[in-house]
């Protein structure tokens, strides 16, 4: 797989020349780490500091698909103005790119479970008709009971189908995610 970083975008997004797969979720849920794990190289910047990704980052996969890493939501230390800016940017992204998005991966932390802003993202996906898969992340850091609880929460929204358990650290879920990206 050949991955090329195209840039960070705040206002204008790249031309919709390729289908897009977008990684969405709360701050520090592991979007950049998961993207790196899936493509097998460290193309997306990773930080332990929540709220580090501030722009919509585009990567070109094998000259046929955009992988999109978006800023996380729900970081408490970000001011109200910054949160509103994020909300508007994301709403504009989904509105403008809805026909170009092949798949959205909604990442949910195995320990934290489904949060109200995750529910709002699911509503956005449904409203804009965007196909999505819930990726339960950081299963290496969660107990079996935490994973079971989060799975139960997620199944209320998506049934049994569109769920992948993952650990970027251990490479778990890579095969399923690649299959959903490439098919």
Curated annotation (Swiss-Prot):
GO CC annotation, single: cytosol
Q: Which GO BP terms sit in this record?
A: division septum assembly
| Required cofactor(s) | Mg(2+)
Keyword field: Cell cycle, Cell division, GTP-binding, Magnesium, Metal-binding, Nucleotide-binding, Septation
Q: Does the keyword Calcium apply?
A: no
Mind telling me which CDD domains this protein's record contains? Answer: YihA_EngB
Where Mg(2+) binds, per the record, is at 32, 53
Q: Name one Pfam family in it.
A: MMR_HSR1
Q: Which residues bind GTP?
A: 25-32, 51-55, 69-72, 137-140, 166-168
Q: Does the keyword Transmembrane apply?
A: no
This entry's Gene Ontology molecular function terms read: GTP binding; metal ion binding
Question: Which InterPro entries does the record cross-reference, listed alphabetically?
Answer: G_ENGB_dom (IPR030393), GTP-bd (IPR006073), GTP-bd_ribosome_bio_YsxC (IPR019987), P-loop_NTPase (IPR027417), Small_GTP-bd (IPR005225)
Question: Which residue intervals define the domain EngB-type G in the entry?
Answer: 17-183
Q: Which family does it belong to?
A: Belongs to the TRAFAC class TrmE-Era-EngA-EngB-Septin-like GTPase superfamily. EngB GTPase family.
Q: What does this protein do?
A: Necessary for normal cell division and for the maintenance of normal septation.
Family annotation (NCBIfam families): GTPase_YsxC, small_GTP
The molecule here is called Probable GTP-binding protein EngB
Tell me the organism: Aquifex aeolicus (strain VF5)
Give the gene that encodes this protein: engB
């Amino acid at each position: 797989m050949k991955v090329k970083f195209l840039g960070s975008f705040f206002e204008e997004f790249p031309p919709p020349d390729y289908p897009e797969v977008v990684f969405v979720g709360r701050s520090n849920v592991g979007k950049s780490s998961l993207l790196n794990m899936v493509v097998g190289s460290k193309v997306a910047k990773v930080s332990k500091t929540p709220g580090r990704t501030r722009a919509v980052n585009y990567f070109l996969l094998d000259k046929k698909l955009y992988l999109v890493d978006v800023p996380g939501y729900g970081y408490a230390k970000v001011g109200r103005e910054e949160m509103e800016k994020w909300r508007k940017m994301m709403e504009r992204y989904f509105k403008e790119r809805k026909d170009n998005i092949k798949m959205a991966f909604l990442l949910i932390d195995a320990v934290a479970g489904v949060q109200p802003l995750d529910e709002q993202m699911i509503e956005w996906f449904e409203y804009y008709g965007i196909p999505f898969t819930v990726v339960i992340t950081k299963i290496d850091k969660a107990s079996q009971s935490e994973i079971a609880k989060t799975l139960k929460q997620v199944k209320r929204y998506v049934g049994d189908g569109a769920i992948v358990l993952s650990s970027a650290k251990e490479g778990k879920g890579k095969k399923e995610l690649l299959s959903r990206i490439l098919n």
